[in-house]
Amino acid sequence: NLEAGKPIVETDFDLRFNEQTYRVESNLGPLVADAIHWYVNQTHHNDFTLAVAGLIRDEIKPGTNGEQLVNDLYRVVPLGSGVFDNSAGYSLAQVYLTAAEIKNVLEAMMLAPKLSTGNYPYWAGIQYKYNPRRILLDQVYEVSLGDPVNGYKRIDLSKKNENLYSLTTNNYVLEFFGLVQEVTFGLLKVSPKDRYGNPVTDLNDLIIDGKPEQAGLQEMKEWEGFIQYLSQFPDVNGNE
């Protein structure tokens, strides 16, 4: 029930982003990651979420009255199309990883922006510590999962920890996981798995079904999650 001209949220400050000059300091990139993380957790358990700079396409500015319409917000993450339904927007997917593989992903994503600024990551649901003085691809030494409200819990990064943790991203970014070994020259490996720990070769099998109680696959879209997240913000100035 989203109409292009429907007001969703108001802001009195800029939410800034520029892939080349303002990606590290951006307050919009983390918002996109937070939105996806919240959206998926409404229907599925999700441990942490990844969004990347290269798929953010517009900033959010207050304009004359601060109102942000559906079409304003859609322009932030408008790219892609469905895997099966061919509707607008990249679909969200969920992959399961071991703690050691999470470390490998973090190591790879610290390297990835050096290959392309579009690879700069924005995370939600995860905190990590690294030492830049350590050798490349072995700098992450602590990872915690959680959220600011309930706190973060450190996880065991050793290979003896066989627990699986869920990561959500869109289907485009998910393809990168198959390239981790290539990007790291074979030093790091990640084996995408389903929730049962079975290795997955067709990454399309990891697309999230937003309404599993219905027949078929109802793809969850990145842009829809962004808008739904903002739409649940309270009206603080009483002009709803």
Q: Which residues does each predicted region cover?
A:
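Catalytic centers of hydrolytic enzymes
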Residues: 1-240
